[in-house]
């Protein structure tokens, strides 16, 4: 006798049983997304953190604030950052005090972003056997500049990409934008396995620097740096053998955390793009990361102990510390994130790709494949990330 799954009642022979898509087992993937090329870059200007602290302190008249500022910079655990412009330079100081309008700053962003983004994109594609026509999608991610036609159009023209290329611009997704962009590119190449996608993240926080009599401005300036990263994404048949150094994107994930809207707030003021980080953000991260990651791993037949690599967004000491604490993993597993934070500061969407690059470059002969989880945080608060494998040998 046939029985209805919903009610347990007998079902007559020949009666059609409706099955929703959600009840069907997932079809095995025929293709997987692979990071085939990766390059990073920064502006040439190196800013020493202790020097920056001393110079910022001089801007404040209140003795208490002047004494507090060096401690803020020291707690950042950042040694150096790279910047397109020095926001404490005399010329930029005049530009800032006029004050510079949002229009002025966006033109400054474009001026410095284009050559850096073009250079990094060329290096990501260097040595790969692609014709320009094979790059079918360009995804540009940034939260520090918006102008159109913008950096994406400049990349298309400078690299000689097809004028019919699809373009997606991811704006104002904050530090999580690289994962959002990567997810878009992954979906594209799996749907169009003969084509490639180029993901470019460019962040120039320095062009938006503002110093008012506000400790939030000081905290923001103590953390953020400038940088660029580019990824070339292709598709591979699941049974294909991949070369060492390739990164397989097994799955992407995104979760909007409840009641955390104040955690990360990006905005636009008359004189630039603004960022506010709530004192509640570390608590949101501690309570939110483990449930999101654990569920994603469960969906992929894994658990936290199965993960070899943890690419945690190096957004600041509390971001890394609370992520580690939430997951219950060894502090040593966040070493690459701490290293990127110390050398470059928080480069928003770019930072996580720097961490991933470090992991790819570190040889590990003990295992043929290293499995990792990468994640970052955006306004919402949103946790965006991916499960990946690095092919070692």
UniProtKB/Swiss-Prot annotation:
Changing residue 348 to S: Increase in the synthesis of the tetraketide products. Substrate binds at residue 221. It is an enzyme of class 2 (transferase). Changing residue 175 to A: Loss of polyketide synthase activity. It catalyses: hexanoyl-CoA + 2 malonyl-CoA + 2 H(+) = 4-hydroxy-6-pentylpyran-2-one + 2 CO2 + 3 CoA; octanoyl-CoA + 2 malonyl-CoA + 2 H(+) = 4-hydroxy-6-heptylpyran-2-one + 2 CO2 + 3 CoA; dodecanoyl-CoA + 2 malonyl-CoA + 2 H(+) = 4-hydroxy-6-undecylpyran-2-one + 2 CO2 + 3 CoA; dodecanoyl-CoA + 3 malonyl-CoA + 3 H(+) = 4-hydroxy-6-(2-oxotridecyl)pyran-2-one + 3 CO2 + 4 CoA. Its EC number is 2.3.1.-. One of its GO terms (biological process) is chalcone biosynthetic process. It comes from the Bacteria. Pathway: Lipid metabolism; fatty acid biosynthesis. The active site is at 175 (nucleophile). The keyword Transferase applies. The record marks 205, 209 as: Important for broad specificity for aliphatic long-chain acyl-CoA starter units. Changing residue 205 to A: No significant change in polyketide synthase activity. Involved in the biosynthesis of tri- and tetraketide alpha-pyrones. Pks18 catalyzes the extension of medium- and long-chain aliphatic acyl-CoA substrates by using malonyl-CoA as an extender molecule to synthesize polyketide products. Belongs to the thiolase-like superfamily. Chalcone/stilbene synthases family. This is Alpha-pyrone synthesis polyketide synthase-like Pks18. It comes from Mycobacterium tuberculosis (strain ATCC 25618 / H37Rv). The lineage of its organism: Bacteria, Bacillati, Actinomycetota, Actinomycetes, Mycobacteriales.
């Amino acid at each position: 006798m046939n029985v209805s799954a919903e009610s347990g009642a007998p079902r007559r022979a020949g009666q059609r049983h409706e099955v929703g898509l959600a009840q069907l087992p997932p079809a095995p993937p025929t293709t997987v997304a692979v990071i085939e090329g990766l390059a990073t870059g920064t502006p040439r200007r190196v800013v020493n953190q202790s020097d920056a602290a001393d110079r910022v302190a001089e801007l404040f008249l209140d003795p208490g604030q002047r004494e507090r500022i060096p401690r803020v910079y020291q707690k950042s655990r950042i040694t150096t950052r790279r910047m397109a412009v020095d926001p404490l330079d005399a010329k930029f100081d005049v530009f800032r005090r006029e004050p510079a309008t949002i229009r002025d700053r966006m033109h400054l962003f474009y001026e410095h972003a284009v050559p850096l983004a073009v250079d990094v994109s060329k290096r990501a594609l260097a040595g790969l056997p692609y014709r320009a026509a094979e790059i079918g999608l360009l995804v540009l991610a940034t939260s520090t500049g918006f102008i159109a036609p913008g950096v994406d159009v400049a990349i298309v023209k400078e690299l000689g990409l097809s004028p019919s290329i699809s373009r997606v611009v991811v704006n104002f997704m904050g530090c999580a934008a690289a994962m959002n962009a990567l997810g878009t590119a992954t979906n594209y190449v799996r749907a169009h396995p003969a084509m490639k996608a180029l993901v470019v993240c460019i962040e120039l926080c320095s062009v938006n620097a503002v110093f008012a009599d506000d400790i939030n401005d000081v905290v923001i300036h103590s953390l953020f740096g400038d940088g660029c990263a580019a990824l070339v994404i292709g598709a591979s048949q699941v049974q294909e053998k991949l070369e060492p150094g390739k990164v397989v994107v097994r799955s992407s994930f995104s979760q909007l955390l409840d009641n955390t809207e104040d955690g990360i707030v990006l905005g636009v003021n008359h004189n630039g793009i603004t960022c506010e980080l709530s004192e509640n953000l570390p608590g949101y991260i501690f309570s939110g990361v483990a449930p999101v990651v654990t569920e994603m791993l469960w969906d992929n037949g894994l658990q936290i102990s199965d993960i070899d690599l943890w690419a945690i967004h190096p957004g600041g000491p509390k971001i890394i510390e609370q992520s580690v604490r939430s997951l219950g993993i060894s502090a040593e597993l966040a070493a690459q994130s701490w290293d990127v934070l110390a050398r470059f500061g928080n480069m928003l969407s770019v930072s996580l790709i720097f961490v991933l690059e470090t992991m790819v470059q570190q040889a590990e002969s003990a295992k043929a494949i290293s499995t990792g989880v990468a994640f970052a945080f955006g306004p919402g608060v949103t946790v965006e990330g991916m499960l990946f494998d690095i092919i070692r040998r």
